[in-house]
Amino acid sequence: VGRPTAEDSGKSHAHTRRAVLAGGALLGAGALLGATPAGAAGKVVAERRLDDRLVELTVDSPALGGRSTVALLTPRGWDGRRPGDRWPVLYLLAGGDGDHTTWTTLFKVQELAELRDVLVVMPGMPLFGFWTDWWNHGKGGAPRVRTYFLREVVPLMERDYGAGPNRAAAGESQGGFGALGLAARVAGLFGAAAAFGAPVHPVRHPEMWLSGAKFVGVDGYAIFGDPWKQWKTWLDWDPYHHAAGLRHTPVYLASGDGKPGPLDGDEPDPHIPGTEKWVALADHGVTSVTEAVCGEETRMLGDRLASLGAPVDVHIYPGGHSGTYGYRELRHALPMLMAALRR
């Protein structure tokens, strides 16, 4: 893939603004969420109580063309809620595997005392869904993962489950891409956003994400399209190119540098065919090219936000893409996220 190069990072602000306008980024949260929470397009078809705080919902999702799972970590008083009772909401977006349970099994969010008075919403998504409305080779249609979140998950939470208007978001890997992209493109949606080991500038390394999709059996060209032919689509979804939309949103960015860290095992990441270019360019000692690329993209977005005067905190550390560092990084980001929820 030849067209996406480092030059994309030097595009003018005017070019970025055109891409933002083309993507509808200047619409406010109310417009993109639908007129009212009562207009939620999805339907909860099952509820399952997992423990005294954890509830799992099965959602029939027109946007996804099937069913999805959303887990809730409920706050104090939630079981006895009355109409009109509302809590601040932390949305935690799943990574590329789409597995919402990572937040309770790996990140251990249920152990955080700071979240006892917060409704934590953990939606799943399709494998390698990228929190994106897929291009689908020009046909559109399901999975429309962004639409699922904006027009189904959030309205359902606000209509039936006590979610209030004070929202923050965090995500690991592709979930971080989703949290930042949504925060940048939908004004007023989140008061703060955090991303851990995330592809936050994927147009910089398109072959990495196309190859990663193929590696897990997903047609990567169905997501954003071909980076030559659908270059504008790639730009429209890229958080870096919507950085101006984050100028007034506190952001926490964290990523490993791809070199072994204290929480990594001895084995390198499996080789992903198609990533040879980035393997060859990787620094000596890198064992996770995926995380090294995420680290580079994180630095680039952090620098861009800093140049705009945005409130951003960047943490780059030795480590790979296993997700084991998310436990620590979520706790680093939590004061910023909680400050937004208390406003």
Predicted regions and their residues:
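N-terminal secretory signal peptides
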Residues: 1-15, 26-31
